[in-house]
């Protein structure tokens, strides 16, 4: 190997090491910020392998790979598990992004469909609604508590609309959220 190659390889190794440290610091910062908001953490199971899988049909080869490495979801969840007093991992059949509490049924949506209407006509943002459904878990049965959904939805819907309005007024661009900024 040439000396130039050895120098470049050492420089690359050093940059990768610095990137890893920065990712870890960012994860710790995020977990600590969430910890300051409460002591219960409800999440879906880690499924990085599923995100990396190639689609079964079609020609698209695009899958999540580098973006998973850059965000470290597994490390984030392990740090949350370590720091939160109550850590709940919902079962795979919970399907928070597919459930509609107004009709009590699961409706499959495409990944690109970020804003959608519930059966009663209410427009919700997918990620915010999924986090609301995770909030409405019955800790004893690990199922969605429909009564809690009905009682808490108005408050959540108001918070969602305030958040979207704040994002639009301050021209904050949130990638892949479906929120239009003029």
Regions found by a protein language model. Give the residues of each.
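Positively charged, helix-rich recognition surfaces that bind polyanionic ligands
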Residues: 1-182
């Amino acid at each position: 190997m040439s000396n130039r190659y050895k120098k470049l390889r050492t420089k690359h190794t050093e940059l990768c090491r610095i990137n890893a440290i920065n990712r870890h610091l960012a994860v710790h910062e995020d977990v600590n910020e969430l910890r300051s908001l409460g002591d219960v953490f409800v999440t879906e199971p880690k499924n990085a392998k599923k995100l990396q899988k190639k689609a079964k049909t079609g020609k698209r080869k695009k899958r999540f790979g580098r973006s998973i490495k850059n965000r470290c979801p597994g490390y984030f969840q392990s740090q949350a598990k370590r720091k939160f007093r109550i850590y709940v991992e919902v079962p795979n059949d919970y399907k928070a992004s597919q459930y509609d509490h107004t009709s009590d049924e699961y409706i499959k949506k495409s990944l690109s469909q970020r804003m959608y209407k519930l059966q009663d006509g209410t427009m919700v943002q997918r990620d915010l609604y999924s986090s609301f459904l995770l909030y409405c878990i019955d800790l004893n049965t690990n199922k969605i508590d429909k009564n809690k959904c009905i009682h808490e939805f108005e408050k959540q819907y108001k918070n969602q609309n305030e958040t979207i309005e704040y994002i639009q007024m301050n021209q904050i661009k949130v990638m892949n959220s479906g929120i239009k900024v003029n």
